[in-house]
Amino acid sequence: MILLRHGETVFNVLFGKNRRDPGVRDPRLTERGREQAAEAANILAQKTITRVIASPYTRALQTAHVIARTINVAIEIDATIRERFSYDCDIGTPRQTLAVRWPDYAFDEIDDTWWPDREEPISEFEARCETFRRRMAASPDWNTTAVVTHWGVVRALTGERIKNCEMLFHDPTSESNANATLESGQGTG
C-alpha cells in the first residue's frame, strides 16, 4: 500500500515556528498543502491505484479529495488511521458536520465523535495502527491502495518520519516495519 501523509496545514506552519500547539482544531490545508496534494495526485495517477482510504480529519479528506478526483476512484473513510490525539489539531469535526461538508463520501462507519477526548496512550495508538496493518494485509488489493493519513500513523507502521505529502510504499503482509520504500521526495514540513 502507499502511505501518504496529508498536505501542509496551518497547524504545520505555526507549530513549525516554535514547536508549541497553536490551538488550531481540525486544520484545513494551506495553499501550499493543496499544491502538494495536486503533485501527489499526479504521481499516483501514474500508478495503478484502485482504492483510496482516508482519515476523517479535514486535512486528510482535502488531500484525498484531490487524489480521488484526479485518479477517479472513491474515498473510503476510516477512523482507524486518524492521528494520535496529542494536540488541538487532533480534535476532529463531528461526523454529521463532515457529512454535510462532504456529501459524496460515506461517513456511516465512524462515530459522531470519532476522536478520543484525551491524549491517546502510545500503546493504544500502536495497537490501532497494528489493527489497520492486519486488515490491509488480509485485503487482496493492498498493493493498489493509497492511504491518506498522518505522520504518527506512518511512523507507527513503518518507523519512518515523512514530510507533508511524501509517500511510502509499505507491504502490510510483513510484520516488520523495515519494509517501507520512499515513493516521492516532494513533501515539505
Segments from the language model and where they lie:
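Short amphipathic alpha-helical/adjacent loop interface patches that line ligand
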Residues: 37, 129-133, 151
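Acidic, low-complexity terminal tails and accessory targeting/binding regions
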Residues: 1, 83-104, 140-143, 155-189
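Short active-site segment of divalent metal-dependent hydrolases/proteases
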Residues: 9, 153-154
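Active-site-proximal alpha-helix that buttresses catalytic centers in soluble enzyme cores
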Residues: 2-77, 99-101, 165
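Glycine-rich phosphate-binding loop signature in dinucleotide/nucleotide-binding domains
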Residues: 45-48, 136-143
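A short local structural element in Rossmann-fold oxidoreductases
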Residues: 64-65, 137, 158-159
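Phosphate-handling substructures
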Residues: 13-14, 18, 23-28, 70-130
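Short, well-ordered beta-to-alpha junction loops that form the rim of enzyme active sites
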Residues: 54-58, 80-81, 110, 148-152
